[in-house]
Each structure stands twice: as structure tokens, then as C-alpha cells.
């Protein structure tokens, strides 16, 4: 089903529902109405992600978002969110169980503004939300869902072997084995530095309510190094060095020292993350959003220049990669 559906997305409008989608959504709607005890008065596709579809629905004049999993084998952190009901995530009102044919999660839409509607630079001092943002991260990072450091596992998931299938289109994938090896050499697992990490803190995943911040879309989440989550947020939220220093100024001194000890590892981690975003978007949707791809590819190039000396790259491959990056400037 997934392969058929993703192929058709190249030629259909993003919010178009396929007949097969209408069929499985009927069972999801029925389950939601049963759990909530109320009828759904409105239901429309909100956006499409490589591993799920998101729908906006209205129940008793209350807006809710429902995500339906399209890739059953891909980890998505939904179960962890539902079991723990974290305060930094919007209230979850309904979700599937292990016996349901289709996996879904349904949560309230808090009153507020997405960072994407606020500014390209939402952590700028003028918005006065730096402390609130860091407080939310601190709350999230304080939770451990297991006693494992999943940071290396996360990097490996960012850079799958299957990516070599698009080598001719995206030659950067030839670096992935070397990148994973370089990260293992530079990063030492330490459970004391771990907690729940979002690892996708971009503008579209953060809602500012005026009093606090809610985080959504935890598909990249893991029990991993929290300092790498902070370094990654610097890049995804377009923080200047000055703004970043202001934000981390709310950390305790020992935390700041540990943060900077992980800076070199963060360069490799961030490179892996942005390439993961490129892969999932391009392999699933092709060139549907070249503006988004350009941003991620330019970020990939930035971190490539920072880590290339750790990868021992042949000159011919280096030229091929640089030529590719040049085409996307």
C-alpha cells in the first residue's frame, strides 16, 4: 500500500484523498468517535509527511489533529507520547492500540502561534521567549524512557544503506558509511547526558501559547544526548551565535561546559540530520518542494565543510559533491 501511495503522490495534489485512504480512514474515524463519544463534524487533510498523513478535524467545536501512520515498520515515538502524556506535548485525547488495523494519534490544537508563523528567527531576543523555550527543552530532557543512550542508533537511522539507490541523483550518500564511523569515533555514550530528545525542533513543530511552548511531531525522537538536541535546535531555528549564547545563558554553568564538549560531535550529528530530511522528502515526494530541499541541502553543505577533514574523502568524490551543492545555491 505504501509504495503505491507514495508513487501517486508525485502527481496528485497533497490534500487529495485516494480511494484506499478513504477506506482506511473510515475505520479510524469510527474508532475516534467511539472513544470521544461525539461525532466528527469536519475532517480534512492538513498535510502529508513521509511516514504519516495528518488530518484536521472538529469535534464539539474543538480543533484536533489526527496523524495516521503510513509506515508501520518505521518507529514514530507515538506510543511513548501516549503512555507518558508529557506536559510539553499537546493533550492527547485518543489513540490506537496494538490491535487496531491502522495506527493513529489524536491530540488537541492549543491556542497559540506556530514558530513558522512568528518569524524565521523565533528565538530572537525581541520575542522574549528564549527562557520559555529553554525551560520547555529542560522539561523534555529531564525524562528518561529507558536506560540506553540511543544517540549512535539515531545517527545510523538518519543514514540508511538504502540511500545508495539515489547516488546518481544525490552523491552525498556515498559519505554515509564514513560519517557513521566518524561519529562512533568521536562520540562516547553517556547515559547521564541522555533524556527524551526531539531531534526535529523546526519552526513547524513548535507552538507558542503566550504562556508556554508545546512541541509536536516527535517522529525523530529518542532517548539520547540532550546536548546534541540543543545544538541541532540552533540550526533548525536559525540562531545566530549571539542568540544561541543568550539562550544557553539560562543553563547552569556545568551544563554549558558539557554542551561545548559535545560541539564537535554535533557537527557530524547535524550533517546526518539534514541529510535524513533530504532523503525522506526526496525519496517520498521527489521535487514537490524545491525551496525546502534547497534549505536542507545548503545546511548539508555547511556541515560538510566543517567535517570533511574527518572523513578522508577522495578528491573525485569531493568534487562531485561540491558540484552538486553548487547547483543548489
Task: Tell what function each PLM region has.
Residues 63-105, 119-139:
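A conserved alpha-helical element in kinase catalytic cores
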Residues 113-127, 146-149:
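Short, polar/flexible loop-turn hinges at active-site or ligand-entry regions and domain interfaces
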Residues 105-113:
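Short pocket-lining segment of the protein kinase catalytic domain that shapes the ATP-binding cleft
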Residues 56-57, 66-68, 94, 109, ...:
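Conserved hydrophobic "DFG−1" position in protein kinase catalytic cores
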Residues 227-258, 270-304:
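Active-site activation/catalytic loop segments of kinase-like enzymes and analogous catalytic loops
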Residues 47-58, 183-228:
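Active-site acidic catalytic loop and adjacent metal/ATP-binding pocket
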Residues 2-43:
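Juxta-kinase regulatory segment immediately upstream of eukaryotic protein kinase catalytic domains
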Residues 23-38, 145-199, 203, 313-328:
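An alpha-helical support segment within catalytic cores of ATP-dependent transferases
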